[in-house]
């Protein structure tokens, strides 16, 4: 778990969305520009006190699309469990846009600094891909 004050936002990351690297820019409502400006999205995230950082890893032999989808489904399932336990006001930052959830890139979150803050690996040379998502919530 991470306190919101530890989240690092890098507005310059929005260029990755604007270059349409994933193909969803101006097509998916969870993606920019419809999802909001950098400032609006940062303000939305900072409205929560805590964030649960989630990670899955995959080896290079797996289909990355399926692995990312599985990660996002697990994130969504956990969010539903949190709602059942009374945490009804949640914000999900997914690994890539997923349904109505914007990805961490759209929020301009620095994944490396986030991973470091919670003791997780982000970029390594072990041949594995890592997917991150977050569930932000209030106490």
List where the protein language model places each region.
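Cysteine-cluster motifs in flexible loop/terminal segments that predominantly coordinate metals
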Residues: 11-41, 97-108
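Short glycine-rich loop/turn motifs
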Residues: 12, 49, 129-132
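Structured loops at beta-to-helix junctions and adjacent beta-edge loops in soluble globular domains
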Residues: 34, 55-57, 138
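Ordered, amphipathic secondary-structure segments that act as subunit-interaction surfaces
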Residues: 41-82
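Glycine-rich, aromatic-bearing surface loops/beta-hairpins
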Residues: 85-139
């Amino acid at each position: 778990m991470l306190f919101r004050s530890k989240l690092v936002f890098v507005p310059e990351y929005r260029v990755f969305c604007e270059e349409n690297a994933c193909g969803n820019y101006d097509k998916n409502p969870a993606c920019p520009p419809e999802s909001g400006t950098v400032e609006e999205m940062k303000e939305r995230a900072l409205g929560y006190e805590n964030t649960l950082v989630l990670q899955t890893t995959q080896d290079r032999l797996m289909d990355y699309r399926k692995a990312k989808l599985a990660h996002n489904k697990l994130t969504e399932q956990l969010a539903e469990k949190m709602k059942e336990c009374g945490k009804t006001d949640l914000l999900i930052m997914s690994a890539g846009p997923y349904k109505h959830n914007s990805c961490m890139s759209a929020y301009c979150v620095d994944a490396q600094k986030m991973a470091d803050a919670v003791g997780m690996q982000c970029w390594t040379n072990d041949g594995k891909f890592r997917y991150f998502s977050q569930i932000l919530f209030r106490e």
